[in-house]
Amino acid sequence: MSLLERLNQDMKLYMKNREKDKLTVVRMVKASLQNEAIKLKKDSLTEDEELTVLSRELKQRKDSLQEFSNANRLDLVDKVQKELDILEVYLPEQLSEEELRTIVNETIAEVGASSKADMGKVMGAIMPKVKGKADGSLINKLVSSQLS
């Protein structure tokens, strides 16, 4: 089942159960997916493209969460945290830090990286492997710790 089909199914369920918050988030994600399809001039998106849109939505929410907590807006922090929890249901299972560390070490060996100057090469090689399954900032932190 594609992400769009799953969103449609959940949207119906949330309408029936009158779960307004979840319904709003699902509608926003669905709109983002449709906008991306229009932008790419396609009828439907590939699974990879859907994952990219979902990751972008998550990243926006995480950035907002950080900004709201810095501004001490607890009401908005709660709202955005709930949205994040709803969105994370649609992501594929995330890799553990140990699995990521293994992938990082393998990729560093493949690329032959030895210093922080090679970080771009490593990140470029590793991101397609873990797309949607890991947070980019965590990968960045692991790579930089291995290269230092």
From Swiss-Prot:
Transmembrane segments: none annotated. It comes from the Bacteria. InterPro entries: Asn/Gln_tRNA_amidoTrase-B-like, GatB_Yqey_C_2, YqeY/Aim41, YqeY/Aim41_N. One of its GO terms (molecular function) is carbon-nitrogen ligase activity, with glutamine as amido-N-donor. This is Uncharacterized protein YqeY.
